[in-house]
Amino acid sequence: MKEIALFEKPLPVTPVVPLSGDYGDNQFYIKRDDMLPFSFGGNKVRKAAEFYREIKNSDADVVMTYGRNSSNHCRIIANMAASMGLACHVISPEENRERLYNTAFVEQLGAVIETCPVTKVAETIENRKAAYRREGKHPYFITGGGHGRPGTESYVK
């Protein structure tokens, strides 16, 4: 499995100009996730970095996720998997037929995009994971949007 650097140094934290409203003495800051160097940056890269650490220490050979194929989450997960030399499989609701830049990018990265009715998402995910296991593969599933423990941990570090 290839090593990749999703981000290597702390990001700047920028103060926000005073907001309108009564916030007392509170001050607001923004962590500049847009400056992350991997896959055009953003908060989803921060989440992907936590999943990367888990995948790197597992026997996974297929990365699976759920989401709109045009989402930043799917783009970043497909990019991460390709950068690691792993296959990627995206389960996407068929109600999402719009082809945007991210959709083309996900496909160019070699990810398989499988559509299903939104009512069949859980069943489709379980069936696909089982099919990969029957093939002798080891799928690693990332919840849509990168939600879950690793994604949450990325914000408390």
Regions from the language model: what does each represent?
Residues 1-157:
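PLP-dependent amino-acid enzyme catalytic core
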